[in-house]
A protein has these predicted regions:
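C-terminal structural segments of small proteins and small subunits
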Residues: 66-94
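Short S/T/G/P-rich N-terminal loop/turn motif that feeds into the first structured element of a domain
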Residues: 1-56, 64-74, 97-100
Length: 100
């Protein structure tokens, strides 16, 4: 099993209301991948960080294998969510992948 954890910072020019809407859209889009991407075991997006956080949201996923994670990265459904709901609104992305 492989964990794939992403932290994002949203663009500064977004208002608080826009950030809330973007976070909700990202959560809906990414959690909606459950059952649609082979090898994706679990997916959770946390959008309610404490004020002390330096990231705005976190993706926490579990995959059957490193190969499943690699396939996910180019899966058309994932790419559509990333291109439509994530990349246009984020300024920074941090990733940690590890075996469990």
């Amino acid at each position: 099993m492989v964990k794939h954890v992403i932290l994002w910072q949203l663009k500064d020019e977004l208002s608080d209301a826009e950030k809330a809407a973007v976070k909700a859209g990202i959560k809906e889009g990414l959690e909606g991948l459950a059952g649609k991407v082979p090898g994706l075991v679990e997916v959770h997006v946390n959008i309610n960080g404490l004020p002390s956080s330096t990231a705005d949201l976190m993706l926490d996923t579990t995959f059957e294998s490193a190969e499943a994670l690699k396939a996910y990265s180019v899966h058309p459904t994932h790419v559509a969510v990333a291109d439509g709901k994530v990349r246009p609104y984020t300024k920074a992305r941090f990733c940690l992948d590890y075996e469990i």
